[in-house]
A protein has these predicted regions:
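Inter-heme linker and motif-flanking segments adjacent to c-type heme-binding CXXCH motifs
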Residues: 1-206, 210, 217-226, 241-252, ...
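Long, compositionally biased charged/polar accessory segments in the mid-to-C-terminal portions
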Residues: 214, 230-242, 258-268
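Short, aromatic-rich amphipathic segments at membrane interfaces
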Residues: 244, 256-288
Length: 309
């Protein structure tokens, strides 16, 4: 291949032989995917071509031809709902609706030629290629060992694998959507910590929304609050940081980000209230000025009438 493209990789076959597909083919299984199943036969196009069967937008559809076929996959005794789950995931939506071709698809996590199912010990390493800070915090957290001892995967325990939904604050705490209650029950320390963190997320989120509404009212009234609006962005950033810090499973670390955000939100709230108070003061001043002007005009009119008489 060097004469056609010196930089082109030529290890695809070697990788394929290490994959689940390759090993089963070597064992005599003729149903597994081979080169032409993914790349087609005559209509082979580079992966960068949107018409290619291995273009990022089309990879999941290529894999589903086998993996979403219940009858075809019956003998392998593995799930066949991966495509349905992935189609509803935040990753698929980011790719299809958001046009983000760097969003994960099947081969991002499983590999392509060397395709293999990621084990519990390796799945978080796959996720960490994008979610770096979350992975670093989790690696130092007490849940790292607890999950490993229980045979639970790091990321997928809370976020699932194929059907990954957009994370929300409702996932923390003791509500119906909480993932904490899958392991923690009322009365234990973890349950209480989860409730406390959920409450603080809620408090900061409400504080940010309250300040935002005040500043918007002030701005619509013509008051200058652009500096406060910029400061409020810092409070929003603190909320985002707190959500990332949650992966340390350290209430103290989360509190640091929440407390910083609350201080900023309170400061911007006070700026909004001050702006609205100044608006009312200006309105009152305008009313007094108008009243004075009207009184003066009335007095002048009366004086002129008297002069004419």
């Amino acid at each position: 291949m060097r004469q056609y493209n010196p930089s082109l990789r030529t290890d695809q076959l070697a990788q394929y032989k290490t994959s689940v597909h390759g090993k089963k083919l070597a064992g005599g299984d003729q149903k597994v995917a081979i080169c032409t199943d993914c790349h087609t036969v005559h209509d082979i196009r580079p992966a960068s071509d949107p018409r290619s069967s291995v273009h990022p937008l089309n990879v999941a559809d290529t894999c589903k031809r086998c993996h979403a076929d219940a009858a075809y996959m019956k003998d392998y005794k593995i799930p066949h709902d991966q495509y349905a789950g992935y189609s509803a995931s935040v990753h698929r939506k980011a790719m299809v609706e958001g046009g983000d071709l760097s969003a994960p698809t099947c081969t991002t996590c499983h590999g392509n030629h060397g395709a293999a199912p990621p084990g519990l010990a390796t799945v978080e390493n796959v996720c960490s290629t994008c979610h770096v800070f979350q992975a670093q915090l989790f690696d130092k957290s007490p849940h790292k060992k607890a999950f490993a001892d229980a045979g639970m995967g790091g990321c997928i325990t809370c976020h699932s694998n194929h059907r990954i939904s957009h994370p929300t604050d409702a996932m923390v705490g003791s509500g119906a959507a909480s993932v904490c209650t899958n392991c923690h029950s009322k009365g234990d320390a973890g349950f209480q910590t989860a409730e406390n963190i959920a409450g603080k997320f809620r408090d900061l989120s409400e504080a940010v929304d309250s300040s935002k509404n005040l500043l918007e009212r002030a701005a619509h009234s013509g008051m200058e609050v652009s500096d406060a609006e910029l400061e409020l962005d810092a409070a929003k950033d603190n909320l985002t940081k707190a959500r990332v810090s949650l992966h340390s499973f350290s209430a103290k670390r989360v509190d640091e980000d929440i407390d910083a955000g609350m201080k900023t939100a309170q400061k911007t709230r006070e700026a909004g209230l001050a702006a609205l108070k100044q608006r009312e003061y200006r309105r009152m001043g305008l009313l007094v000025s108008l009243a004075t002007i009207l009184a003066t005009v009335g007095a002048l009119a009366f004086y002129i009438r008297q002069m004419e008489n």
